[in-house]
C-alpha cells in the first residue's frame, strides 16, 4: 500500500493525491503531500503522546505548509502555581505550541536543507474529544532560496538527499534508452532532469516569503488569532502573518473583533507606547498587532504601528506594502484576551 501510494503521488501529484501518516510509526516518511489524522477514540485514551516525522521530499524542499483542516484539543487551563493559562494537550511544531480550537488555520514551517520535520502531540488528558486532521505540503524552492545548515562540514559517508524526485527510477525502466542512454548528455535526458529537479509552478505560488509563519495568497479573506473560536490566545506567542500583494497595491483590514491587553487598564484602543515599550520590563503588558505603514481609515492623522487594547471593532485600517502583521503576546494571560478577527482586501492603491 505504501509503495502504491508513493507511485500515485509521483505520477499524479498535480491532482492532489495524499497519503496518510500513522501516529508513532517509528520512522519518517518522505512524501510530497501527507495527511495526519488522530487515532480512533479507543486508542486515544491509551496514548500519552503522538509523534510524526516527515523527511524532505527532495533536496529542494525549504518549507512545509501545514493546513489544520481540523484541530480541536482541550482548552488551556489555569496553572494554580503560576496563575498562567497553559496547554495540557497540545501540538508542538518547532516553536509553536497550539491547543484549543484551530480549525481552518495554517502554518508555514521553514526548513534547512535536509531537515526532518517533527510534529509532537501531547495528550496528557487522554480525552476522547481530541481530534485533528492536518495536511502537510512540502514546498520546493529555487536552489538559492533553500536554507543551508549553519555548519555543514563535508563528510564522505554523510547521507545524501535525492537531487531528483524519486520518479526517475520508474522512468529509467520505462522510457527508451535513447532518452536515458549513455550518449544522451545535453539531450532529452538533460532537459528531463532539469524539469524534474526544478520546483513545480504550484510550489512557487505556494512559497511564503522568508519570515512569514502564515501566508494568505488570495486578494481578500479573513484572519483570526489562534484559538479564536475557543476563547483566549496563548501567552508568549510571536508570529508573522503575510498577505500577497504588489508594490502598486494597498490593503485594508476591517476589524470585526479586537481584544488584546494594554499597558494601562483604561478601556478603549491602545497605540504604540500603550502596547509596546522600547525598554523590556518584567510583568508589563505587551500584547499587540504590529502593522507597518498603516493608518486608521477615518482618521488619517492617526498613523500608529502598534495596536492593542479593545474598542477597535468596526474600525478599518489601511496599509501599504509589504503586507505583514506581527502578532506578539506577553507572558501574562487573562480570560478577556480573546484575540482578533480581521477581514482584509487587497486593492489598487489610490
State where each predicted segment sits.
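Domain-level representation of secreted and single-pass membrane ectodomains enriched
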Residues: 2-350
